[in-house]
């Protein structure tokens, strides 16, 4: 037999003998009446320690769950803060601004009420026929526009073009709504053209054509302009009706 194997066998036998001795010693201790109370106390402490470890493990798991929830909440708050900052930095100039009347003293309120209730401003709108205009797009709507449509166009540029097109709509339909006798020669020529451009598909609709845009605005009807129209169609602000060599932009 190899000397190394013999040494390993001897070490194994000695280890077993040592283990048997310790077992016999513990057995003898367990049979000693004077040590029974000590062993019982140790057993109780071991049981308490086991319960404590279980409670500790449960608490660790609970804290991990809370930590995960807090991380998710932090991500949500950071995202909302980023969106709010973007909205604050990109507030459209078209929105109404707060007037000083909101911070006026209480004794000024009766005067403000009298001005609002004045009969003349209340009667003026009823004398004019309403003209349908396009609503400005929201930041959310602009976010839904595909990137290939946007190209380098910005949210503000799209709302600016909406305002320009609304000028053309208002300018055209003010002429249409005026009595014929009150129109100038130029306005009468425009009125005649408006009538010729109407079709059965445009009945009851508000629409303009390229010539109206040239007459009432400084907008260039070019490739960039038609790119903006694609975004307005996507956002359901207008649609097109073609016929008789004209493209009619119907206000939605």
From Swiss-Prot:
What species was this sequence derived from? Xenopus tropicalis (Western clawed frog)
Cite the residue spans of the region called Microtubule binding.
129-252
Lineage top rank: taxon:
Eukaryota
Protein's gene: ska1
By sequence similarity, the record places it as follows:
Belongs to the SKA1 family.
- CC per GO annotation: cytoplasm; meiotic spindle; microtubule; outer kinetochore
Gene3D superfamilies assigned to the protein according to its UniProt record, in alphabetical order: 6.10.250.1370, Ska1 microtubule binding domain-like
What InterPro entries does this protein map onto?
SKA1, SKA1_MBD_sf
Name assigned to this protein: SKA complex subunit 1
